[in-house]
Amino acid sequence: MSETIVAVATAHGIGGISIVRLSGENALSLSDILINKNRKKNKTQNSVSSSQNRIQNFKKINLKPRYATLCELYDNDGNFMDESVVIYYKSPNSFTGEDIVEFQIHGGFTLENLIMDELITNGARIAMPGEFSKRAFLNDKMDLSKAEAIQSIILSRSKSAAKILARNLHGELKNFVIDLRKEIVKTMAFVETCIDYADDDLPNDILDKIQNLLSENITKIDEITQISASRRGLLEGFKVAIIGKPNVGKSSILNSLLKFSRAIVSDEAGTTRDRIEENLQIGSHLIRIIDTAGIRKSENSVENIGISYSIKAANEADIILAVFDASREFDKEDEKIFEILQNQKDKKIIKILNKIDLALKFKAGNSDNFLKISAKNDTKIITKVLNDYLNSQNFDGIMLSSNRQIMAFSNAGKALKRAQNLLNENSLELFAFELNIAIKEIASIYKPFERDEILESMFSNFCLGK
């Protein structure tokens, strides 16, 4: 990690301010080259000397750690580039644990590129994606759970997600994992006692204690894994599928919710043959709303593919909007929609009776359970019901924020369940082996056991400058 790295830490583009970030042992010296007021006098010397000589030839400027200093920036030919607020973070009290210098410059591609080019010419290297965070991890400035929380917060698209992820950033997930690991280690200690003193008299209830500890830990792992999977909508957007038979107004509802015309609306049944997906912000939540092909029996092979996609969308959705036509009598196609809903009892289902501005002919069960709307006139009630439902959900507590974390917990749970079966068979050595797998998987949430492979995979998904 001796190389000094540089990247733009803010979003690229035109804006008020851009931040160029340097990290490494030569960060301060490289900054001095840009800031030195005598650059014009040293123009000839600078143009012929190597980057390492330039670093050595300039004295370190008097940047006070954690203070903002207004400086002028010059290129290697002594030409003025920009005024910058420069902040120096002295090692080890910085994000990466190394010397960091940040240049707050005027925003825009041109200035960013000018400053970056000068720093690279003088010896810095462009940072790889996530390299600043990777250095922070390697220098023990953060653990993996915190690094993933930072990345998830950056990518989060709802206030609810940001609030939960802030808890992970604050260390709640790591503390939970440490406590869980201690419980599994405690179970391991009991097992090793049984193995080491197999010929001695042991308490009669020791196997019961092991079994109870094992069951408790399996329950904890299963709960957090299931809760985290059900809350993926907080990070990715809650999937809302609009389903119904053809020509009930599904596309009209989509267009009305989006407040622009996204789907083709026609009196001809079967107009929508492929799923249409759009993002929609409702309150503090991101919604991924999906319009689907009308579900019916069809001889058209292309339409049947669309219908299969509709059923798949319902299966994958967090919330289903089931739409029926108030102006048409209840028929076998509507009955088919009810059959699909019967298999989705674990989801929020909102039944909608559309076209209430026309003569009412639809009759099916308790119509009080339907939202009665006219998509042509107003769909605000749908937005309100969705917002009220999501606001009523309990999103408190710990959440696994990445697929890597969910996989680690899932693998740990599987290992403990295998261990449970081995305990019943009195295979204590194999039982201990499975416990070791679980311990490693749980600990990998904040400290991986396959270090290089996991770090490379994880940090490569981070943005540049982070």
Curated annotation (Swiss-Prot):
Domain of life: Bacteria
Residue numbers binding (6S)-5-formyl-5,6,7,8-tetrahydrofolate: 21, 102, 141, 466
Gene3D superfamilies per UniProt: P-loop containing nucleotide triphosphate hydrolases, Probable tRNA modification gtpase trme, domain 1, tRNA modification GTPase MnmE domain 2
Group of enzyme by EC: hydrolase
Pfam families on file: MMR_HSR1 (PF01926), MnmE_helical (PF12631), TrmE_N (PF10396)
Cofactor(s) annotated in UniProt: K(+)
UniProt-listed Enzyme Commission number(s): 3.6.-.-
One MF term in the entry's GO annotations: GTP binding
Chain residues that bind GTP: 247-252, 266-272, 291-294
S-S bonds: none
Entry-linked CDD domains: trmE (cd04164), TrmE_N (cd14858)
Cofactor remark: Binds 1 potassium ion per subunit.
PROSITE patterns referenced in this protein's UniProt entry, alphabetically: G_TRME (PS51709)
SUPFAM superfamilies in the record: P-loop containing nucleoside triphosphate hydrolases
Chain residues that bind Mg(2+): 251, 272
Keywords: Cytoplasm, GTP-binding, Hydrolase, Magnesium, Metal-binding, Nucleotide-binding, Potassium, tRNA processing
Metal-binding is among the record's keywords: yes
Residues annotated as domain TrmE-type G: 237-391
GO terms of biological process kind: tRNA methylation; tRNA wobble uridine modification
Localization terms from the record: Cytoplasm
GO cellular component: cytosol
Task of the protein: Exhibits a very high intrinsic GTPase hydrolysis rate. Involved in the addition of a carboxymethylaminomethyl (cmnm) group at the wobble position (U34) of certain tRNAs, forming tRNA-cmnm(5)s(2)U34.
PANTHER family named among the record's database cross-references: TRNA MODIFICATION GTPASE GTPBP3, TRNA MODIFICATION GTPASE GTPBP3, MITOCHONDRIAL
Family, similarity comment: Belongs to the TRAFAC class TrmE-Era-EngA-EngB-Septin-like GTPase superfamily. TrmE GTPase family.
Subunit structure: Homodimer. Heterotetramer of two MnmE and two MnmG subunits.
Official protein name in the record: tRNA modification GTPase MnmE
Organism from which the protein derives: Campylobacter hominis (strain ATCC BAA-381 / DSM 21671 / CCUG 45161 / LMG 19568 / NCTC 13146 / CH001A)
Gene name of this polypeptide: mnmE
